[in-house]
């Protein structure tokens, strides 16, 4: 009896150990990847000069141009500490990785946007002041250059070969913790995110936090298959949804920046929307798919080729268009000046149309990037919101002569109380046209606190007036 108990115990122990070893054997070992790549992943810190007003200042100081004799004269009669606003350094952190042994580094556009100085720190703690060779907002890719040689370069893979469920690994500097390693799996491929139409993101559940941006995403072969770019979160922290830029797209952008200082993208010239189940039925489709053409822009490649409103684009250069979000990346990476084969559904019949692809009119790239005031969002504390400029092309497409776009609403605040929404385009304040960020600043500074003011905003549904009451904060 005692022997049987011992036998049963030994059998159970053997099964437990066997299962443990089999589970352990089935898990990937990331140590080799980390060891081989650690010298090629860098920490990036930026410094930005921002105005700093004196908290003891009792009265507003006129904003004279730098070096103005009026400004110097005015300051002579002010008490100490009430002169022109001083400036302080604002710092932020990110990651990047070396793509050539002579010092070229890849990172995100948003990591270095607006930077006055960029410092790159290697794994051995060596630091370099980096030059921003170029930065492309549309793809969120930036290229840096440091004065160094014989640097270790990472290997590049092919993100097209990735499979959903495959293990991936990220290395970066979340919250400044250098060379932190996290792992997860590929959750989906070809994701489209708002305002990032030209990037088919790789979605993963790898833990990504502030500071990881710009760092590499590896496959199990130790090859870079993406650049960690952003997360989806309702709290600001990691919630299991991370997005990376495919490495092929990033390297294509980087090469264009290095060679020409700008990025060229294909342009079709249509406004599209998703095909719903009800629309699919009306078009004689067995299931909803494709991109429905809602508008064909005048003199565009699509117009010249004969594309029409109501056409459903179901294929582009041999690749299926399952969702409307699939089309912009396909068009964007097509070759300018060459014919593209566009498969459409028209009058319940499928047909092929050749379209000569033109270059996207709006260039979001800035070679030898230098921040401009007009590029940066402007905030109105009294109105409780921040706005950004519209490009000429955006104004043209929206058929607007003026306007600035709302990108952030303070909660609570005047804008929230007035019912203003992110994405609203403000074209008029207090019966004055808003043509630029400068107009927005000038008009809002002259508003009376507590007095209701009319704003004209443009929404997809059309223009609407809203009343807002500036708050004295």
Which positions does each model-derived feature cover?
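Gly/Ser-rich catalytic serine loop of serine hydrolases
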Residues: 92-95, 154-156, 203-218, 298-302, ...
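Short, acidic, Ser/Thr-enriched surface-loop or helix-capping motifs
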Residues: 93, 99-100, 122, 127, ...
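Active-site substrate-binding loop(s) of clan PA
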Residues: 31-33, 121, 131-133, 150-177, ...
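Bacterial N-terminal signal peptides
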Residues: 10-20
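Active-site loop architecture of trypsin-fold serine endopeptidases
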Residues: 29-30, 47-57, 89, 115-118, ...
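C-terminal recognition in membrane/secretory proteostasis and scaffolding
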Residues: 2, 8, 21, 26, ...
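Glycine-biased strand-turn-strand hairpin within the trypsin-fold
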Residues: 27-32, 37-105, 113-115, 126-127, ...
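Short, conserved beta-turn/loop elements at beta-strand boundaries and strand-helix junctions
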Residues: 101, 135-139, 190-194, 275-277, ...
């Amino acid at each position: 009896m005692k022997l049987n108990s011992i036998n049963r115990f030994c059998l159970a122990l053997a099964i437990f150990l066997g299962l443990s070893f089999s589970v352990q054997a089935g898990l990937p070992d990331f140590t080799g990847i980390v060891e081989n790549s650690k010298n090629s992943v860098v920490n990036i810190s930026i410094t930005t000069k921002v105005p700093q007003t004196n908290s003891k200042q009792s009265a507003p100081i006129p904003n004279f141009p730098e070096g103005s004799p009026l400004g110097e004269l005015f300051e002579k009669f002010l008490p100490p500490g009430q002169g022109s606003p001083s400036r302080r350094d604002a710092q932020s952190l990110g990651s990047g990785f070396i793509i050539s042994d002579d010092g070229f580094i890849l990172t995100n556009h948003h990591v270095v946007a607006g930077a006055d100085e960029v410092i790159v720190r290697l794994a051995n703690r060596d630091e370099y002041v980096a030059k921003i060779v170029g930065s492309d907002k549309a793809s969120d890719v930036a290229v840096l250059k440091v004065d160094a040689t014989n640097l270790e370069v990472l290997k590049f893979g092919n993100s097209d070969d990735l499979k959903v469920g495959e293990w991936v690994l990220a290395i970066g500097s979340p919250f400044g913790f250098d060379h932190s390693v996290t792992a997860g799996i590929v959750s989906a491929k070809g994701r489209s995110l708002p305002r990032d139409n030209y990037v088919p993101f790789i979605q993963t559940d790898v833990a990504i936090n502030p500071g990881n941006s710009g760092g590499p995403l590896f496959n199990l072969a130790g090859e870079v298959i993406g650049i960690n770019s952003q997360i989806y979160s309702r709290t600001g922290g990691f919630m299991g949804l991370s997005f990376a830029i495919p490495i092929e797209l990033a390297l294509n952008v980087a090469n264009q920046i290095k060679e020409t200082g700008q990025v060229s993208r294909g342009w079709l010239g249509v406004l599209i929307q998703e095909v719903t189940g009800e629309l699919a039925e009306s078009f004689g489709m067995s299931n909803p798919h494709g991109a429905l053409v809602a508008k064909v822009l005048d003199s565009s490649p699509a117009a010249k080729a004969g594309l029409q409103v109501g056409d459903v684009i179901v294929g582009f250069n041999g690749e299926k268009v399952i969702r409307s979000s699939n089309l912009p990346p396909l068009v964007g990476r097509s070759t300018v000046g060459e014919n593209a084969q566009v498969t459409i559904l028209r009058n319940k019949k499928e047909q092929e149309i050749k379209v000569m692809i033109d270059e996207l009119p709006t260039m979001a790239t800035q070679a030898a990037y230098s921040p401009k005031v007009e590029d940066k969002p402007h905030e109105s504390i009294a109105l409780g919101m921040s706005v950004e400029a519209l490009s000429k092309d955006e104004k043209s497409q929206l058929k607007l002569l003026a306007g600035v776009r709302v990108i952030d609403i303070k909660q609570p605040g005047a804008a929230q109380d007035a019912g203003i929404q992110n994405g609203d385009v403000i074209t008029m304040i207090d019966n004055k046209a808003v043509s630029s960020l400068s107009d927005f600043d000038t008009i809002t500074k002259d508003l009376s606190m507590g007095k209701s003011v009319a704003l004209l905003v443009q929404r997809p549904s059309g223009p609407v007036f809203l009343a807002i009451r500036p708050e004295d904060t």
